[in-house]
Every structure is written in structure tokens, then in C-alpha cells.
Amino acid sequence: MDLLSGTYIFAVLLACVVFHSGAQEKNYTIREEMPENVLIGDLLKDLNLSLIPNKSLTTAMQFKLVYKTGDVPLIRIEEDTGEIFTTGARIDREKLCAGIPRDEHCFYEVEVAILPDEIFRLVKIRFLIEDINDNAPLFPATVINISIPENSAINSKYTLPAAVDPDVGINGVQNYELIKSQNMFGLDVIETPEGDKMPQLIVQKELDREKKDTYVMKVKVEDGGFPQRSSTAILQVSVTDTNDNHPVFKETEIEVSIPENAPVGTSVTQLHATDADIGENAKIHFSFSNLVSNIARRLFHLNATTGLITIKEPLDREETPNHKLLVLASDGGLMPARAMVLVNVTDVNDNVPSIDIRYIVNPVNDTVVLSENIPLNTKIALITVTDKDADHNGRVTCFTDHEIPFRLRPVFSNQFLLETAAYLDYESTKEYAIKLLAADAGKPPLNQSAMLFIKVKDENDNAPVFTQSFVTVSIPENNSPGIQLTKVSATDADSGPNAEINYLLGPDAPPEFSLDRRTGMLTVVKKLDREKEDKYLFTILAKDNGVPPLTSNVTVFVSIIDQNDNSPVFTHNEYNFYVPENLPRHGTVGLITVTDPDYGDNSAVTLSILDENDDFTIDSQTGVIRPNISFDREKQESYTFYVKAEDGGRVSRSSSAKVTINVVDVNDNKPVFIVPPSNYSYELVLPSTNPGTVVFQVIAVDNDTGMNAEVRYSIVGGNTRDLFAIDQETGNITLMEKCDVTDLGLHRVLVKANDLGQPDSLFSVVIVNLFVNESVTNATLINELVRKSIEAPVTPNTEIADVSSPTNDYVKILVAAVAGTITVVVVIFITAVVRCRQAPHLKAAQKNKQNSEWATPNPENRQMIMMKKRKKKKKHSPKNLLLNFVTIEETKADDVDSDGNRVTLDLPIDLEEQTMGKYDWVTTPTTFKPDSPDLARHYKSASPQPAFQIQPETPLNSKHHIIQELPLDNTFVACDSISKCSSSSSDPYSVSDCGYPVTTFEVPVSVHTRPPMKEVVRSCTPMKESTTMEIWIHPQPQRKSEGKVAGKSQRRVTFHLPEGSQESSSDGGLGDHDAGSLTSTSHGLPLGYPQEEYFDRATPSNRTEGDGNSDPESTFIPGLKKAAEITVQPTVEEASDNCTQECLIYGHSDACWMPASLDHSSSLQAQASALCHSPPLSQASTQHHSPPVTQTIALCHSPPVTQTIALCHSPPPIQVSALRHSPPLVQATALHHSPPSAQASALCYSPPLAQAAAISHSSPLPQVIALHRSQAQSSVSLQQGWVQGADGLCSVDQGVQGSATSQFYTMSERLHASDDSIKVIPLTTFTPRQQARPSRGDSPIMEEHPL
């Protein structure tokens, strides 16, 4: 398939290339003597013309044989198919190629033109004529005589004349044979260098002239063709006397050149031969061999005696350029000498070029006829120029003598195509006589000329042209038929029938006109009426007689001139106008419309009123009628007059019309009541009147007419009980119901009478007083009631005037007074109840006001906080409060050594220990609502208070306190975290409920500036009264670590617990030790903290249990002997990487700040178990430092929120494994937020709240849970806890003996699943006899040993 496709593409490309070149050659092979109508080839297939893309051809493809006029071609070609056939002419190779050497091929050439011009190509076809054996070889003579000396040696050879065969190749002479030689002679054949075969006679026996002097035999020559042809000749051998020597040529081969114009007698060459004999035997005779052609014998002369060769006739190189002359030199013997003379005739420019015209377009009487509309490049003839001369003498060019719309385009050597170079135009040039010139390149050049005649045939390519492009004619109307209007004319540039023009009316021409077909005269055949048609616009056509005919048109405009032949015409014969009677004077009554079909002045109409009527005027131009009077319908209802209309024609025409003006009534009168005559009249209605009885009739009249006078009645007021009804047309008032006692009295009925006028109806009203009673006993009272009713406004709810119930007003007043009294009493009662309920709150507010000097909230939040306090219901705690006080010192940041200003805050305290004992530590949590945005919640731990009993005998010097650094812009209230004032409210300033005495403690505290970031833990020293732990935190957390910035002040808060307090602050759990103990460490710490510094932090924010926002994880345990003062400086990154917006505003707390992890060697089960009991944030943090299996197990047991957080920070393998056990919501959320390499920097931190109660079931701890560490006293035993020894973490069930330093860890427990608060139980050092016992679940309760 690929091969076929490639072949097809190659053929297409070849066809395109060939056709683009414009000329092509094709070779065929034919044999001579072929019969007629033998198929030679198919040009359509052989030239791949069927592969040419299908083009839109003007005519079908045509093949035309181009040959010279008078020639008889040997072949013919089918014009439609391109098939080539032989003709009846004989194909004779020997005749066609007589002058060429025998060793050259014989060709016959013709040209074929492929039409039409869109695909024109000229193809030269060369036919190679193959020789057939149609000629027999012949000897020069039928009898060959030869003489042989009798002393010829045996095997001597004597050359015989050669036979000649016109055929070539195998069909030529191939063999000779000697017949009847009597064994005396034999025959041998030799081949000359030119390829000729020469017979030689061989002497086979000794000759004896005396015995026999003559031998006669036959010699036969044969060719090699099929069938084989041969001929014979008689060979007569004469035996002569002995001849000892033979002639010898001095030169056996001679080649000479002689110009073809050499004159006759010119010596060609001189031959020299010698013979050693003497006498007669020495005489040499020169002669041409019988192999020399007849042409050579005719052109050259050989002197038999001297051997001189001369020109006998003029030479012609173009006829025979080379001649071979075989010369024999004989001394009379039988062995002549041979010499070959080769004569080359050189060319001279003796031949003029010849011009051969072969027509592609068949001529008529030697003239080519071309249509003027033939396309460009139309091929006309093939011009072949030849020159018989050689080289540059035969190089010919051809051209025309002057500028003509034709050109010669070369296609083959010395062949040119004559084609059109421009469009022909019969109208400009009708005939062309083209002179063709041909010149060779010889010196001097020779030229030749020929004439070619072309006649242009006219085509109908020109349409008639009118002399006018637009014809305008005017004619008056009312004309006589047959009037000639105008004559139109047109010309045509064509000739003959193409120029004959006929005139026709266009299809849009009206029937009123006619046109002469030959002359173009336009005539009106009907009477024209301008009022029907004022103009005519139509076309006239001019059509020639060509094929196809061509037409053109001209527009004719006929304008009709008007005549005053029409009178003005009113739109109506009679006009009736209706005007209201209130039409003002000179108002518009109406419009008279008049038309006149004429034009111009003939249609200018003027209007006027006849009979000199002065009551009305009419505008003469517009026809508007206006009154000069005021109308009164009652005086005159209509007016009549005539209007005249007259045109402005030369002979004017007029007409008139009747006008009637009718005055129309206007609704300008209201109905007037006749009955009742006034509003003061009344009608008596007896209570016994039956329903449906007409009790009264109102009558109203209207002075208008028609609908304006039609009156309708209706009740529009009074009649509140619907006791009466009125007929809208008659005005009869009918009683609708039976009257009872309540209906007695004067009824005031408002009756409306309105007309039906349009567009606005007019109306009047009247009061109809109907007195329902048995009789009129007191006319004065009735008249008074009527008078009062007239003075009172009338509404649809007008009540009746009851003469029998004068006390009704007093009853209404009494009812209103009672209702008002009851309302006042209810309002007073409600007010008292409300104030009673608000009394406790008012007292609490008063106390808050009294304590405002030491508890002042942030100014921006004061108003909002106070509003919250009023709205929330406070929960009251037991009446006990620890003794606390806070001292806040502020200094300028730029003066480090300044003493600063001391500010003392007074806090309420209660020193009674019995009160403390009443507080329920277990049931009263110190948690806050998670969404509370206040400072107290921010700095307060979210865990409930631990349940333990504080011993009152704890000495003051054993109490621990911690300094907490707070943001400068926050006011921290030092109210007890487990007190009533803050345990149940999110308001951090709700201290007014702490209704206890106030004791003031004042402790001086030095102002600290922020130490450098690389400062390590201070040395810890024992304190007698109190121990201070100071932690500095920059007020504004930043993302980048930086040192102390000058100009920013710091603040610290010191919390103290006095002697005898029931609550103490917690420290880091340090016992008695020296400063050197701080340097010991067991493993690396995160964030660059020193080991001791990290573990000595009481809370992430260094807050104490003794303030109002204490951290439960730092709960004090009785028995601690000493505390330490440390300063921890977390970097800015430590305090801000996991900060929330609340932390950035209020400062850092355990809600947002998380210390780094401690250990990386945790048990998988312990990690998973711890995560299952940790809050979401801790679980997510743990995920970051746990091995994959632990992460997956932990995630499967975590609540959805924890799973989502952890998944978002876990690597992809963990996410995939955990998601298999996660709910759909967690899967979708985690996958959406988890990056490919999920890591979170926040996982490096974990607050103390994240410790899990499940830690009791495994020895190792999760590596990311932040654990507190404390130093153990000697001889300490614990029921439950863990210690870090040499072998790692282990349970302290066995107890820790001796003075070895041990590290203990806290535990935490979630109260319930929905609560974010974590109860943290710190395990710290114990004095002897102290132990930890289990409490709720796994949370131990620390208590003093019984001893």
C-alpha cells in the first residue's frame, strides 16, 4: 500500500512539474512498414494527465497534432483520448534516414498540443524507427571478373567486391558462400574497422594456365534477418601469366578536410603508389572500389594515371558531411593495393534559416481567425526555425518586427510558440499581419522572414450606449392622445448584427406611453390626469441582436403640468359642531377642512362665511371657526350658516358647505332640595309603624337637562342602627325594622342628592330629622334637640338623641374613673416588685463603686463590663476568701536604676479559718466560659481547682509566691481564683461580691529591665518571708527575636500569702538546694532554654495560684520548705509562634503558649493512650513527635476535632492510615487542609494542660507532653507517681529513699468530653510521712501523712 501511495504521489508531482514547464518530450518505438491504424501509445495515460487535479476548464481536454501544412504525417492522434495510431503513409526507414550514417538511430519527430489554454502543453513525440529485413543484399554486378596469376601460392587471398544491403544491423550482410568452386578456390570473410564484411577468394590448389585458364563459379551473399534474404553473382576467375610484384600505396589511410564552398576542380588529395616491376607490369592504374557510394563518385574525380582526387561537383555539407573513398592501385595483376581516403566537408554559413509554421489554430485560407474575447496566452501556432549549417552558423533566433498583442515563447531548441500577449479588441484592430524574422549567428548572419495573418472575429461584447443617461419630459394634463414626447437613441460599438439596436419599454413603464421599436420615439397614447398621477418614472431598454444579446437602459421622467380643472371640495357636505354652553368667547368651535386636487395656486383655497354673519368668524387659511358671542343654551340651542371655499386659479373655482353649531348643556347646577324645606324641620314616626312603611320622602330638583338633571338619593350620615333606608330614585325613606324602646328619640339622617352629570357629578345634602315617639308632647324639647343636632358635626356614626336617658354620660364617666384607678395600682405593684428584685444588685454595685480605687478595669472595657454585670445573674460562693494582695511597680524603661513609683492595691481578705473550711473545693470549679474575652479568663487556667485540704498550721515562710509579668496595657485583678467573685462569672472585675474587710499589704518591689535574651536561670536563694519568681515577657509579642528595646517599660506583679492563709501560691517545686544544683540535666531541652530554667517554670506564663487568675497546675502542697526565685526569659518566638489574636492583645497564657517537647523515647501505647485523653491541641501537638504507629492509633481514638487538627499536621502516610478509621467529616477536612508534607511549628510546644490521666498505665511518657519536674526530699514515698532514675522513668510505688534527686511528674484529667477544662494534679516533693492517695479516677489527692 505504501509503495502504491508513493508511486501515486511521485506521478502527481511529475505531472505538476511537467505541466509547469510548458513543454515535454515523449519517446515511442515503432517498426518500419507498419500497417495503418496500429495503436502506438496513449498520451493521457503515458503523460499522467489523468492525475492532474480537476480544474474548471472552459472546454474539454483536447490533443491536437501540430504539423506543417501540406505534410502527410505518418501518425494520427485522437483529439479526445490522446491515443496515437499509424496512418496509411508508408514508414520506410531507408528513405526517412537515407543521409545519416548506418550506425546512427533513425527518428521521426512530431509535436502535439494539449488544449485548452488553461492546461496548454506542447509535447514533442520522437518515434524511433526500428529496421526490418525488407531488403536483400546485392553485389555490385551480376558477373564478377577477377584475374589470378598462375604462380599464386596456395592460400593466397584475393579480395572480391562486397555486396551492399540497405538494412542495418543483423538485417545487413552477414555471410558469403562460394558455390561450385571445384575445390580449387575457397572463400573467407573479413570485417573492416568500419564494420563492413569483405569477401576474399582463397587459392587452395596450384594453378596451371596451360591446363585451364578460366574458372566459372557462383558467389552467394546472405543477411541475418528473419526471414533471411540472399543473392548470388557469377564469379569468373581468369588465370594469367606470372606477375612477381604488386603495387604498394605510400599511405593506406588519408583524412582530409575541405570547405563545402570549395570550387569545382579543387584538389582534394594526391595518392602515391609504387611497383617494383618493370615494363608493363610497372604501370599502376588507380580506380574507386565498388564500395564507394554513388554520391561520392558523383562529387569526386580520381585520375586513373596520377591518382589525384579532385572536386567534380559542388560539395554540400548539409547533404553529406563525410565521404569515404576506397581507392585501388593495380599494375594489371590480380592483387591491387588499397587506400582509404576520408573526406570531411567543413561547414560554411551558406544556408539561410528556414521558418516552419505549424498552426495550432486551424487557419482559413492561410489566415488564422481569432475571437476578440479569447483569453490571454492563447496558443496560435508553433514556429520552428532551422538552419542546415553547423555550430553557431546553425544557431537561429526568431522574433516579430513590431509591437503587437502577440509574443513568441521558446519551448524547444529553435522552436517557439506564438500566443496572445494582450486582449484582442475587434473595435480597435480587426486584422493583424505578423512578420516573423529568423536570423542565424553566422558571420555575416543570414536571416529569413515569414508572414502570418490573423483576423479578429467580432463578438457581442459591447452593450448599446444611450446618448443621454437621464431623460426628462414635461406635458400638461388633459392632453390629446398620440402626442410625441421625445426620441431616445443609442449606439453599439460592435459590428453587424451585434450593432443592430431595438428599443423597448421597461417592465415598469405605464400603459399611457408607447415606444417605436426601431426609431425610439416615445408617444403618449392616453389622456393624462395630474390629480391621478402627477409624474411618471420608468425605463427604456436598448437591445442589440448579438448572441447573446446585450441590453442597456435609460431612465425617463415624465412630469405632468397641472391645470385648474377641480373645484375645492369640503370633507363633508354639512358640518355639525357641538359646543358647551360655557365655551368662552373667541374659543374654538371647530375646523372646516377643504381640499383641492389641483397643484400650486390652483389648489390654494380661501374660506369665508356667507351672508355676513357676525356671530362667528372663520380663519381663511386654517378653517378654524370661533364665536364672537357667549352661548346660552336656554336662549338659543343652535346656529346655522354657510362657508364658501374658493381656489386661486387663473379662472377660480369655488364651492360652499352648511355649518350648524349646537349648544350642549353643561352640568353647572346642583340638585336643590324642595322637601324637606330646611334642616330644622322634623317628621314624627310612630313606634308602631310597620317595617317597609314610607315615613318620609325627600324631593330635589336640578335645573340642568339630560343626565345632568337625573337625581339619585342616598343616606350618608346618621342612621347608625340601619333603621331607615332610602330609595335612590324616588327619595322615599322607609322604616326597615320595628321600633323598640331604645329607638325612641330624635334620629338625625343625612341624605345626599347627586346628579348623574359628567365628568363630575354635583350633589347637595340635607338633614332629615325623624322623631320616633308616640306624640309630640314637648315641641320645645324637640326643637332644642334639633338645634343641637344641627350644631354638632355630622358623621356616619351620629347617635340618636334619646330624650328618655339623660344620665348616660354620668355612667360613662364613672366607668372611666374606675379603670384609671385600677391601672395606677397595677403599675405601682409592678414597680415595687421590680425594685425589690434589683435591691441586691444595687448593693453589689455600690460596693463595686467603693472598691473602684483598687480594682479598675481597662478603660476601654469598663462600660461594657459594667453592662455585663447588670445582665448576668451572679452565683454566690461560700463566704470565705484568702488573704491576697498585689503590688504593682512601674518605672520608666530608660532608667534602669530608678526606684519608680510604687502603687499599692488594697484587696479584701478574711483571716477566719473556719470560713475557709466551708468552701467546697471539689464541687466549685474555677472554670470560665470558653468564649469569654476578658483578662481574668485569659490569665486564668481553664482547669478546675484540685480537691485537697490545706493545713492552717503552714508557716508563712513556707508559702510560695511568684512574680508574673503582665502586659503594660492590662489591669490584672488579684482576686482569688477560687473565690465567689470570679468563679462563676466571666467578668474579671466582679470583686464587689467579695464582701469582706480590706487589709492593705505593701511590699516594695524593684523595677526590672528586660535582661538579654541569652540570660540563663538566676541562682535560687532561700527566703524567710516569701520567695519571688520573676519572669519577664515583652508586652508586645513579635515574630522575631530581639533584645531589650530602650523606651519600653516593664511591669511585674508580686503575689503574697500571709501567715495563716488557707491557700498558697505554687512554685516550681524546688526544695532546699543550692545554686549549683540547677546545672544538672538529664536530656536536652527545646527552644534553647537551660534545663533547669525550663523545668523551674511554674506555669507557661509564670502565674501563681494566689492571684485571681492562678494556674491549677502550680497548686501548693503543704510540707514544702523552701522556694526559689528564677527568671525565665522566653524568646519572642517562644511566646508568639502559636499565639492567638487574644494573646497578642492581652498577653500570653497557657491557652496559647506551649513549651517545647522533652523526650523522644516514649512508648507507642503510652503515647496513643495519652492522646486519647488529651485536649485537641495537645493531641495534635503529640502527633508531630510520635512515631507513625502511635499517631495512627491516637487519631483513631481522638474526637473529630482532634483528628482534624492532628491530620492536618501529620505526614501523608499517617494521614492515609488514620483516615481509614476517621469519620467522613474528619477525612474531608483533614485532606483539604493537609499539605503534602504536613508539619506545623506549633507542634513543638505543649502546655502543661496536655498531661493525660492515662499516663498511670505506662512507664514512659509521650514525648511531646510538657511535664513539670521537682526535686525530691530524702526519704519520700509515694502511693502513685513516677520518678526519673538511672533507668529512665519508673513508677514510684516502691518509693524513693535517700537524698537522691528525683523528678516527679503531674497528671491531668478531662472532666467531661464537651469541656475544654483540664484538672491538673501536680506531683511535687513531699515531706516525710506524706503520701498521695487516689481520688476520682486516676487523679490522686495529696494529703498529709497521719504522723
From Swiss-Prot:
Organism, scientific name: Gorilla gorilla gorilla (Western lowland gorilla)
Alphabetized CDD domains for the sequence: Cadherin_repeat
Segments in the Cytoplasmic topological domain: 834-1347
Summary of the function given for this chain in its UniProt record: Potential calcium-dependent cell-adhesion protein.
A GO BP annotation: homophilic cell adhesion via plasma membrane adhesion molecules
Domain Cadherin, chain residue ranges per copy: 26-139, 140-249, 250-355, 362-466, 467-570, 571-673, 677-795
Protein's membrane topology: Single-pass type I membrane protein
One MF term in the entry's GO annotations: calcium ion binding
Identification of the protein by name: Protocadherin-11 X-linked
Annotated stretches, region: Disordered: 1057-1091, 1097-1116, 1326-1347
Subcellular location: Cell membrane
Residues passing through the membrane, by range: 813-833
PANTHER family named in the record: CADHERIN-87A (PTHR24028), PROTOCADHERIN-11 X-LINKED-RELATED (PTHR24028:SF254)
Gene: PCDH11X
Signal sequence interval, chain numbering: 1-23
Principal cellular location given in the protein's record: membrane
One cellular component (GO) term of this entry: plasma membrane
InterPro entries: Cadherin-like_dom, Cadherin-like_sf, Cadherin_CS, Cadherin_N, Protocadherin, Protocadherin/Cadherin-CA
Glycosylation sites: 27, 48, 54, 344, 553, 773
Extracellular face of the membrane: 24-812
SUPFAM superfamilies: Cadherin-like
Pfam hit, one: Cadherin_2
Record keywords: Calcium, Cell adhesion, Cell membrane, Glycoprotein, Membrane, Repeat, Signal, Transmembrane, Transmembrane helix
